[in-house]
Amino acid sequence: MTVAKSTCASVSTKPAVGKPTNGIATYSPAYTIVPTYECFNRCTYCNFRTDPGESSWMTLSAAEDIFQRLQNEQVCEILILSGEVHPHSPKRQAWFQRIYDLCKLALTSGFLPHTNAGPLSFAEMQELKSVNVSMGLMLEQLTPKLLETVHRHAPSKLPELRLQQLEWAGDLQIPFTTGLLLGIGEGIDDCWETLETISKLHQRYHHIQEVILQPHSPGNQQTFDAPAFNPHQLPEVIAKARQILPPDITIQIPPNLVQDEQWLVACVEAGARDLGGIGPKDEVNPDYPHLQAEELREILQPVGWELVPRLPVYPQFDGWLSKELQASVRRWRELVIYF
C-alpha cells in the first residue's frame, strides 16, 4: 500500500508503546487442513498454490489420522483452507464434497470447523453453514486496478464477486471473517474505501466477526517483485481501521508477519486485539513460522497484555448456529479457559 508523504514522514523508527494496559488480546488454538493446494487463480503474490492436477487432495483417512493425533493437543479450531477449483470444472462437485466431508469429520472428531475456500455459490455456502461455526473470505482490496497487475490471472478476485460472498454470508447469518492484504499495489484511499465497504455491510447484516489486516510478506514461491509492507506503518493503519470499523468488529493481525516484538505490541495497542489462529504452520505464508502462544505471552505480558484463547465463533453469534453446532460450541466454551 502506498502511503502519502505526510503519513510516511510521521512514522517513527520506534513504536509508540504506552504504559502497561492490563488489556486482553485473543487467539484461536487452531490447526489448518488443506483439502488441496491446486488453484485456478494465479495471484502473483501467492506462496500457497499449485497448478491444477499437480498436488493430491487430502483424503478423509489422512484427516482422520490428524484429528486423532490432535485429541491430546490444545486445539479447538480446524481451519479448512483450500485452493480453488473453477466453478465450471467437472471436479468442482467432488472438491466441494471433500470440503464438506472434512468439516463434518472435524465436527464428529470434537473440533470446531471454519472454512475459507474462495468464492462459493449461495447453495454451497448454505450447505457449509450446517458444518461450520464460522466462515471467511479475504476481500484483499476492492480497487479494480489490481485486476491489471497482481490479479491479472485471478478470475475469482473480481471485487464484486467477493463482495457478493459477504452479502450472502449476511443473508445466511454466517459469522464471517474478512480482511485486507496490505502492500500489493493499492493506494491509501483504496484501503480506507475497502474498510468503509466492510463497515457498511456489517451495519446492514451485523455478521462480521473480524477484519484481518495482513501485511504483504514476500515468500519464495511468489513472482510479485515488491518489498514487504513496512511494519512501521501498520499501527497507523490499524488505528485508522479502528476508527472506520464498528466497535463490535475485532481487528486481527498475523503476529508472525510482524517480526519486531516492539512493533507487535504497538499493533495491539493501536487496536488489533486478536492474533488469529495459531497452529504448527502458516500455510498462506510458509516462509514465516507461527509464534506459538507461550512465545506471544512472553512478549505481551510484560507490557500488560493478557493472551487469552477464544473459539472460532464469537459468543454473540451462537444463536445463529444449529442446535448441533451450539452444543459443540457450549462444550468448548467450558474447556477453552483451561488452555
UniProtKB/Swiss-Prot annotation:
The record, for Pfam families, names:
Radical_SAM (PF04055)
PROSITE patterns found in the cross-reference section: RADICAL_SAM
Reaction catalysed? Answer: 5-amino-5-(4-hydroxybenzyl)-6-(D-ribitylimino)-5,6-dihydrouracil + S-adenosyl-L-methionine = 7,8-didemethyl-8-hydroxy-5-deazariboflavin + 5'-deoxyadenosine + L-methionine + NH4(+) + H(+)
Q: Which family does it belong to?
A: Belongs to the radical SAM superfamily. CofG family.
Q: What is this protein called?
A: 7,8-didemethyl-8-hydroxy-5-deazariboflavin synthase
User: Which Enzyme Commission number(s) are on file for it?
Assistant: 4.3.1.32
| Subunit structure as annotated in this protein's UniProt entry | Consists of two subunits, CofG and CofH.
Q: In which pathway does it act?
A: Cofactor biosynthesis; coenzyme F0 biosynthesis
Q: Which InterPro entries match?
A: Aldolase_TIM, CofG_family, Elp3/MiaA/NifB-like_rSAM, F420, rSAM
Annotated GO molecular function terms are:
4 iron, 4 sulfur cluster binding; 7,8-didemethyl-8-hydroxy-5-deazariboflavin synthase activity; iron ion binding; transferase activity, transferring alkyl or aryl (other than methyl) groups
Q: Where is each Radical SAM core domain found?
A: 25-256
